[in-house]
Amino acid sequence: MNQTLLEQFGNARERVEKGLQALRDGQGVLVADDENRENEGDLIFSAESLTEAQMAMLIRECSGIVCLCMPDEKIRSLELPMMVEDNSSRYGTAFTVSIEAAQGVTTGVSAKDRVTTVKTAAADGAKPADLSKPGHVFPLRARPGGVLERRGHTEATVDMMRLAGLKNPCGVLCELTNPDGTMARLPQLADFAKKHGMVLLTVEDLAAYRESQEN
């Protein structure tokens, strides 16, 4: 990992704390995983403060596969089955079936409709009947141990919502891409973060932060 690129956003602890404050302020953060893993950066927003403009940015600047990261207990309360029974994906990404809000959407694919779906699913007291399946939002189940159990963007998202002290631990993510459709790597992630006034941190930063807080 190129520390020179990362250090313009502070040291590891500062990057995490800036990211947590950004989430409290309703802003987005960029989180990169290890270069030997997916080697990708995800743009992350909290579900509770997500706006149509932020969703439009996710659709425009990223892969378009907007995911809603939720704790295991939330997935179970919504009775969302996993997408496949036998997950053979390389990194064990825990997709459930895709979802749509049962009310208040049209085709489900617009930024407005996807925000409606995210907020419907993430809401306190949301019920299985509030959602239709399949849809245009892709829920992801976070491991209970967060990034200390799995060094994934899903776990990083839920961990950050909790560490930020947000009422709702759910968050949305999408992988940042370049204009030509290739995946954005660390240099492009740093450029994007600077252009949009965001902080760039890593999953490893977050894991180290949690370990220092909890030990």
UniProtKB/Swiss-Prot annotation:
Pathway: Cofactor biosynthesis; riboflavin biosynthesis; 2-hydroxy-3-oxobutyl phosphate from D-ribulose 5-phosphate: step 1/1. D-ribulose 5-phosphate binds at residues 37-38, 42, 150-154, 175. Mg(2+) 1 binds at residue 38. The keyword Cell inner membrane does not apply. It catalyses: D-ribulose 5-phosphate = (2S)-2-hydroxy-3-oxobutyl phosphate + formate + H(+). Keywords: Lyase, Magnesium, Manganese, Metal-binding, Riboflavin biosynthesis. Its EC number is 4.1.99.12. GO terms for cellular component: cytosol. One of its GO terms (molecular function) is magnesium ion binding. Mg(2+) 2 binds at residues 38, 153. GO terms for biological process: riboflavin biosynthetic process. Homodimer. Belongs to the DHBP synthase family. Catalyzes the conversion of D-ribulose 5-phosphate to formate and 3,4-dihydroxy-2-butanone 4-phosphate. This is 3,4-dihydroxy-2-butanone 4-phosphate synthase. The gene is ribB.
